[in-house]
Amino acid sequence: QQLLDTQFVEAADDIAMHYAVDQDQDVLAAAEQLMGDSWFGRHAYYMAQRHSAANNPTYLYFYERRPASNDETIGASHALELNPLFGGFIPFWPTDARDDELSEQMQLYWRNFAATGDPNGAGLPTWTAFDELNAQELALGHERSYSRPVVRADRYEAMTNQLLRREQALQPVSSD
């Protein structure tokens, strides 16, 4: 609650509705999701909205592949996707065939986008472009990769609305 009150001030209760906690053990998971969404997810979503509104080819992804380690606790953390994207993995963490497949897919998507402005290509699951009317993301997950509606869009929207209200409050008042 302190994190919500500090970061979201007047919108804390509205944001909290998206991170409901039923049991004590859910508190850590909700806090981890809140931090990830507020520090990274909402900003990527906002930038995708602005980028696509300017008619630029826009593709958003959500990395879900957790390390295959018995010791991990926070799931797919920030920047963890950089390992498969660049074809390397964290030493001493177990990997499997899906890690290799995901690494190859990600490299192909990025290479295709750099060459053509479209990440899609032969043999790859379709990555649907993001636009404001059809907010899609590519889920890079455990079993497979697939396009879907942005799963946390309602959370990102609530956070973005709060940020925009703050921004408007800082705008100078016109002397007209």
Language-model segments: residues:
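Substrate-gating cap/lid region and adjacent catalytic-acid/histidine neighborhood
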Residues: 1-100, 109
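Acidic/polar loop patches that form or flank catalytic/metal-binding clefts of enzymes
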Residues: 55-62, 116-126
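Short secondary-structure transition/capping segments
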Residues: 58, 106-111, 166-175
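Short, solvent-exposed polar/charged micro-motifs at secondary-structure junctions
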Residues: 69-73, 135, 148-150
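Non-catalytic, well-ordered alpha-helical segments in soluble enzyme domains
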Residues: 99-122
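Mature extracytoplasmic/periplasmic domains
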Residues: 120-148
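Tryptophan-rich aromatic "cage" segments
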Residues: 143-176
